[in-house]
Every structure is written in C-alpha cells, then in structure tokens.
A protein has these predicted regions:
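Terminal amphipathic alpha-helical/low-complexity segments used for targeting or macromolecular assembly
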Residues: 1-116, 122, 278-283, 287-344
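A generic local structural motif
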Residues: 14-16, 149, 199, 243-244
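A general structural motif
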Residues: 22-23, 48, 158, 252, ...
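Generic, low-specificity signal for short hydrophobic/alpha-helical stretches with a mild N-terminal bias
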Residues: 24, 64-68, 101, 105, ...
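Extended beta-solenoid/beta-helix repeat architectures
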Residues: 101-208, 223-224, 250, 268
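Glycine-rich hexapeptide-repeat left-handed beta-helix
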Residues: 165-166, 172, 178-343
Length: 344
C-alpha cells in the first residue's frame, strides 16, 4: 500500500491498525529492500536483537539489543526511490524467483529477444514482442498480454493482471496483481488492483492500490527547461529536491482521474482524490481533494468510504472495519494539508 506519506508518518497513521505487533515476530523496516548480504544478517538475528546501520534500524526480533550491520542496503524514504531503484530490484527478484524453476513455453506467434523471460502457469500472450536484452521479463500466474504489445524489459506483471492491446513497456516497470495497464509505460510501479487501461503516457511514476487513470490521461516526467524536479514532502511540508531530471506522477491509494487528465512533472496526488478538468492541476493535491485546475474542495469522508467499498467489492474484496479505520485515520491526520489550500 502506498499512501504517499513518508514511512515514519505512514507507520504512525495506520501501520499498527492493520499489522499489530505479535510476540515472536520478525519486524522489518518499511521500505527496506533486500540483498543477499542483508538477508543473511536478518536471518541470523536472535530473539531480543535489533539490526542497525548508523541511525537506521533495519530489523528486529522484539528487542533492542543492537547488532551492527556494515553491508550494503537500500531503504526507501521518498516516493521517487520506488521507481528509481526498480530496475535493480527487478533483476534481483527475477533471479530469486526463477532459481531452480522452469518457465512455461512461449507461444510461437511471439517475437522473442534475450533469455531472461519467465512465464508462470496460465500466462496468455500471443502476437507480441518480448525483448529481455535490457531487462528481465517475469509474467506471473494468470497474467495476460493482449496482441500487438511491445515489451522492452524489465517488466514484472503480477498475477491475473492484463496488458491491453498494443501496450508499450519501455522498461523498469512493475505492475502488481489484478491490474489493467495500457498505452505507454516507462519506469513505473503500479500497485495491485489499479487500472491505467487506456492510451496515454505514464512515466517515472508510482500508482497506489485501487487507483484508476481515465482514458487519454498523461503525466509529464521532464521539465521543458530540463531542470531538476522537486516533489512535495509531507515531512518537510514543502517541495523537496529529488536530484532527478525525470520524475512524473505519484498517486496514492483510492485516487482517480477523469479522461484526458494532464499531470505536470513532479505531481503528488494524495489518498482518495478525484481529479478532473482541463489544464494542469497543481503539483500537490492533498488527500481527499475533489476537483482540478478550476478549483478543489474537500471530498466527504463518508462518500470516500462508500466509493472504496464499491470499488473493492467489484474485485470480491471486503472493505472491512480495518480498511475503514485506516482511511479515517488518514483523513484526520492530513486535514492540515487541506486547510492550507482552502479545501477544509
């Protein structure tokens, strides 16, 4: 789940609601990305020990006895880290998931380049191009790639997800389970149960769960003057430097945009927003925003609950009390951001 909020704030808002602590559990730092050396160190932790590196705790087994870790690791602290580091993580995951396994056969109607392609059972792909020479391609169980698609790896396509007719993937892209994606996608991460099913460009971007991108919508990922792109931070309450020339859209869970929506480079959309209207909306759209370039108002929490319930029920998922409590907690904790923009 991505709520755009940086890890510390995210944990404070809902982490303990959905994942209460249990004795004997191994606790991993949110946003910690694995490598073989780190995995070995974590597996060696004993009850009561905590693995640390400098000021960062990485993992613990219900204790605070500090064990120093001096090896390499990556820790996601900003949303742009997610797509920036995705290429390397795709290759790590591909090696881990395919070790000792045999891919299902690739239908003869496809054009195939490179060897790093793996299909799980039930994958449906015909009359498409699979090029793994620049990155691996992993297609999970029950996923589907419609004819005419061109895949330039890396790509990880989640179980029961679909790439629509003529989809173009430019690499370093992850699509979670039960999602539909189409158009042009470059270096983006789409969480599960989200749709960008139509033409339009999504690049250097992150979409949370239960998002929907209307047909013909696009995001810019490069400023016309080629300057560094800044991105709004909930922690600093300002637009922070990313050090990136390419940075597109970051959209949190349960948010949606209408057809032909255009997002400027470095746009952050909070939780449960509904964006529509001609022109570019502002670069930070607070959680529970309703509107677009012509103006924004606060989206009713009650209506947000009803919409989330409808959306999840379409995928046979229950919008239970825990999910409701999380959305309510985010609504309360982000009120200050709407207040500063005239929404509340």
């Amino acid at each position: 789940t991505i709520a755009v909020l940086e890890p510390l704030m995210l944990t404070h808002v809902w982490g303990k609601i959905k994942f209460p602590e249990k004795k004997g559990d191994l606790h991993l730092r949110g946003g910690l990305l694995p490598c073989h050396e780190l995995i070995k160190a974590i597996n060696s932790l004993k009850e009561g020990e905590m693995l640390i590196s400098g000021e960062d705790w990485l993992a613990h087994r219900n204790g605070e006895k500090r064990i120093a870790y001096t090896g390499d690791f990556l820790l996601v602290k900003r949303p742009e880290n997610i797509f920036s580091w995705n290429k390397e993580q795709l290759e790590f995951d591909f090696d881990l998931l395919t070790s000792g396994r045999k891919s299902e056969p690739i239908h003869h109607s496809n054009q195939v380049f490179g060897e790093r392609i793996f299909l799980e059972k039930g994958v449906d792909i015909k009359a498409s191009v699979l090029n793994s020479e620049e990155g691996s391609i992993y297609l999970a169980e029950g996923s589907k790639i419609m004819p005419g698609s061109v895949i330039n790896g890396g790509l990880s396509l989640g179980n029961s997800s679909t790439l629509k007719l003529g989809t173009k993937i430019y690499g370093a892209t992850t699509v979670g389970p039960h999602s539909k994606v189409g158009g042009e996608i470059n270096n983006s991460v789409v969480w599960g149960f989200s749709n960008k099913a139509h033409d339009g460009f999504l690049g250097n971007a992150v979409l949370g769960q239960w998002c929907n991108i209307g047909a013909g919508s696009n995001n810019s990922n490069l400023k016309n003057n080629y300057d560094e792109i800044k991105l709004f931070s909930y922690l600093s309450r300002s637009f922070d430097h990313t050090g990136l020339q390419f940075c597109g859209l970051v959209m949190a869970d349960h948010s949606k945009c209408a057809i032909d929506t255009s997002f400027n480079s470095g746009t952050v959309v909070g939780v449960s927003c509904n964006i529509f209207g001609s022109g570019f909306p502002r670069n930070f759209l607070p959680d529970f925003s309703w509107g677009g370039p012509q103006g924004l108002k606060e989206y009713s929490l009650e209506k947000a609950h009803l919409t989330a319930k409808k959306v999840m029920s379409r995928r046979n998922m229950e919008y239970n009390q825990i999910e409701s409590d999380i959305l309510s907690a985010i609504f309360s904790s982000t009120r200050e951001f709407r207040g500063g923009t005239g929404l509340a």
